[in-house]
Amino acid sequence: ENTQPALFVNSFAIFEFFARAGVQADYTAGHSLGEYTAIAAAGGFDFTTGLRLVRQRGLLMSRATRGTMAAIMGADFSAIEKICAEIMHAGDIVVPANQNTPDQTVISGTPEGVKKACDALAAAGAKRVIPLQVSGAFHSPLMKEAAEQMKAALASADIRDTRVPVISNVTGRPVTSGAEIRDLLYQQ
C-alpha cells in the first residue's frame, strides 16, 4: 500500500533532478513498478495520475492470493519453462515471471509450486536458487484478479501518447501510444 507509492515518488524525484539539470532522455525504461515512473517521465501521464495508479496497484497486489517468488541463476530459460509447465500440469502454480538477464530468471507462484520448481531446477543443475522475500506471487496467474481490477483503474486514467518511447516490460519494444501503454500496463 505504501511501498509502491514511496518508490514511485523517489524515482520520479530522481527523474526531476536530472530533467532540471538539462538531461533529456531519448527513451525511458523501468522494471515492473519502475515502468510507471518511465511512463510519467516520458509524458504518458502526470505525477498525480502515476501516484494514484501505483497506489491502486499496491493495494490490489497486497490483497492478491498468497504466493512467493525465487531467483534462478545459471539455468537455461527453456529448462525453467519446461519444469514450470510440468509442475503446473500437476496442479500447482509456478511460472517464469521475469527474465532479468540471460543467466537469471525469477519464477513466481504458490509456495508449493515455487518450492517444487526450485528443487527440480537445483537437481537439474541450476547454479543458484534464491527464495525472494516478497509479499506475493507477482507477475503470475495469482495476480489475475488484481490485474482485472487494475484494468478498470487504467481505463479511467488519463494516459497519453509519450514524448519519447518507453521500453515495455511486456514486449521489450519501444512504445509511444497511450492506448498501447494502457494495455501493456494491464498485461504487466
Residue map of PLM features:
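Helix-rich "cap/lid" substructures immediately adjacent to catalytic or cofactor-binding pockets
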Residues: 1-29, 107
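Residue-level recognition of oxygen-bearing side chains
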Residues: 2, 33, 112
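A broad detector of short, well-ordered amphipathic alpha-helices
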Residues: 9-16, 35, 48, 52-55
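Gly/Ala-rich beta-loop-alpha elbow adjacent to hydrolase catalytic centers
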Residues: 11, 26, 30-34, 38, ...
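Alpha-helix C-terminal capping segments
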Residues: 16-21, 39-45
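Short, flexible active-site-proximal loops enriched in glycine and acidic residues
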Residues: 21-30, 47-50, 95
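Alpha/beta catalytic cores of group-transfer enzymes, especially the acyltransferase/condensing modules
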Residues: 41-188
